Every structure is written in structure tokens, then in C-alpha cells.
């Protein structure tokens, strides 16, 4: 986006202490919007408290996502999972910035977000923003392995529980991208909610400009 002059990019910084993300900052210089979060103290946009949306039906929701930008990169799996979402009436947008998409989930502009092939610096700050805004984050299996696994699903609790069973059989960690989906149904919602709400991660920091 930045290279092509499209005004949708950001600076995304997260602080990780002892494997836990404790501080997050995402700055959009084009709109002068500063998203911040401190673990246990809420999420804010330009010092105003923000919350995830409360929409609970896919047909009323706006979802952010990211399509493969390299040829043949999981394209069959993406196309397979898009059909049930479209059939259920979900409206989707691809903005090109995973970090801003997560900030938009935190502020309720997007109701949910999902994408494959992400790096820790794409999602570290945004994951804390979402959880501090009352949302949930995880991988497509409903687990907390989103930093190392490259999968990110974020949204309000209701939509999260709806999207996991749709994404997991096609894009879950146990599915090989080039093979037919073969995993079982998603885990029980109770176990998902416990795992997703943690901002756990490996023992390393994450601070990078968002170039996704």
C-alpha cells in the first residue's frame, strides 16, 4: 500500500514481557489515528475507549480478510472457505494491512478478521487491542497459537464462535493446504474461549512497521 501510494498502512509496535504482550500501539499517519492498549486497562483510539462490535449474525457483519498475494499460496483453501461465508451473507473487505484490520475489529469497524500467512509483527499489537476491547483472538482451531502459526482469527465472542467451525475444517493447523480438508469439527466453544482470550506467545519481542 505504501509503495503504491494507497493511504492505508500503519506503524505497529507491541511490547512482550515474559512471553505476554503487555503494551500495544498502532498508528495510522494518514488519518492521525492512534490505537493503544495496556494489558488489563482497556483499548483506546486517540484516548477514547473503544469496544468490539456486538453484531452476532454473519449476514449483518463486515469481515476483514487477506487473500494470498503470491501465486498459488493456499489459494484453493481460501476459495473453498469463502463460499460458505458468502452463502451466509457475510460481507468481506481486503484492505492490505492486517494490523489496521485488527485495530478496526477493536473499534467495531470490522466485526471480525481472518487471514493466513501472517508474521508476529503483523498481529502482536492488534491482538492485544482486540482482547482489551472485549474481543477474542486465536488461530483457526480456536487456540492461542496465532503468533507462531501464522493464522489469525479475531472478532467479538459470538462471531468468533461462529467462524471457527467454518474456518477450521478448511484452514485449520491440521489441514495441509494442497490436500482436501479432513479435520473434525471445531472444539467446544468453552475450550475455545479460554484459549483465545490469552495473549500468550514465545519468549521474544515484536516491534515492526506493518508492511503486510
Where are these regions (language model features)?
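Acidic beta-strand-loop-alpha-helix segment within the catalytic core
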Residues: 12-102, 149-212
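Glycine/serine-rich anion-binding loops at beta->alpha junctions
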Residues: 1-10
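Short beta-strand and adjacent tight-turn residues that come in two discontinuous sequence segments
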Residues: 115
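Small-residue (primarily alanine) positions within well-ordered alpha-helices
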Residues: 24, 43, 126, 133-135
